[in-house]
Amino acid sequence: MAVSRRAVGVESARKVLQLLLCFDAARPRAAVTELARAAGLPLSSAYRHLALLREQGLVEEDGGGRYRMTPRVHALARAADAASPLVAAAQPILARLAGETGATAVLFRIFGDVAVAAAAVEPRRPAHLSGVSGRSFPLHKGAPCKLLLASLPATVRAAVLDRIERADPAERALRRQREAELVLIRRRGYAESDGEVDPGMWAVAAPVTQKRRTIASLWLAAPARRLDAARRTALREATRAGAQALTRSLAMPPDPGQARHARY
């Protein structure tokens, strides 16, 4: 019985967090119905979990029946960035990648059933993709998300796919296709997507590892219309080199007062 209560508690906590992660730069405000649909929750559950988030001062109603995050969440985000050696180590590598390739460079981390853009650097020239940092995406859509999903242990990966199917029954027909794609991603060591999340954008992602475990994905995205075969090959190579550089940087012993850098 104790195990059952714990399982129920964990599932409830997961749903609260999924609801909070529905907010991002593309969706700073949302009605309860929209949040429930995005999180795959019954409307009654969404109301209940939002009440808890309001009680903790993490969301508030804007007066028009829509909800938004409070400044308390921004403070948590700043604290997370300040404390994260991963984000600190990634920033110079993302900046170099964006500057040298002209693509948007983003670091993604996995939180529950979503991937969150933990850090992003946009190129100087227009890239038709902005406001990525802080956005969250489902694990079965987009190169960085699918790469993270592919890296999970088999039982965890299957559980995630099961939850995705419960939220969207249409996904059941795609299960074998999804699993085959994840096998391919693991075999070749990177993932690609073309307009899967952002229309007109081609993207490639590579794994960042620590102690032989994938902890993040590094992603480059650029308008597909600008990319011929040679350019896509160059972006694949740059993405993998950047991810390997970040992996090496994380393996270096910390140097107090100095940022760690690993050249790719």
Residue ranges and their predicted role:
Residues M1-A83, V87, Q244-M252:
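N-terminal helix-turn-helix
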Residues G9-A13, T70, A83, V87, ...:
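Short, structured helix-loop boundary elements
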Residues H49, A89-E100, L184, R188, ...:
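Amphipathic alpha-helical regulatory segments at dimerization interfaces
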Residues V59-E60, L107-F108, V208:
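A structural signal for short hydrophobic beta-strand segments in well-ordered beta-sheet cores
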Residues G65-R163:
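Amphipathic alpha-helical effector-binding/dimerization core
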Residues A170-A245, Y264:
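Extended hydrophobic
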Residues D255-Y264:
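Signal-transducing coiled-coil/dimerization helices and immediately adjacent hinge/linker segments
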